[in-house]
A protein has these predicted regions:
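AAA+ P-loop NTPase catalytic core and its hallmark functional loops
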Residues: 1-150
């Protein structure tokens, strides 16, 4: 993970932003059980201005909407951001049948009892992770309403 920050230093990304990312990671340690969910990006996203805008937005507590054509690096950037912050990531692919229960979770029967089975958005929020919402343009209003509440 520090290699991503080293790469960003070499790319000339604002050192104050990189220091803030390191401080964030130190202030928000991750349990060992979640470490395998931290992405190990196969590719590095390059683009100093995009990195600086994305880092600043996340450090300010904002969400990002990465828009663009096919093969423009949106998922690569999202994976790199999660790795840079040292946070687990959940890839959530939307489709026309996606509903609120698929995202947040639902009750299910297990071991003779009704138990709550958390969905990916619930787990992501609970663990302070990055939710990579793919094909969000396919989402129904019901699913989008859940995201507005998160």
């Amino acid at each position: 993970m520090s290699d991503i920050l080293d790469t960003l230093r070499q790319e000339g990304v604002d050192p104050a932003l990189l220091t803030a990312v390191q401080e964030y990671r130190a202030a928000h340690p991750l349990s060992e059980a979640l470490r395998p969910r931290i992405p190990a990006p196969a590719f590095t996203y390059y683009g100093k201005e995009v990195w600086e805008q994305a880092l600043a937005a996340i450090l300010c507590g904002e969400n990002l909407l990465l828009a663009g054509g096919k093969a423009t690096g949106r998922n690569v950037l999202a994976e790199n951001l999660a790795a840079a912050f040292g946070r687990p990531a959940w890839d959530i692919s939307f489709h026309v049948n996606m509903d609120a229960a698929s995202l947040i979770g639902m009750d299910t029967f297990a071991g003779g009892q009704v138990v709550f089975r958390p969905g990916p958005v619930y787990r992501c929020a609970q663990c302070g992770g990055f939710g990579v919402l793919d094909e969000i343009n396919m989402a129904k209003n019901e699913a989008l309403a859940v995201l507005h509440a998160v």
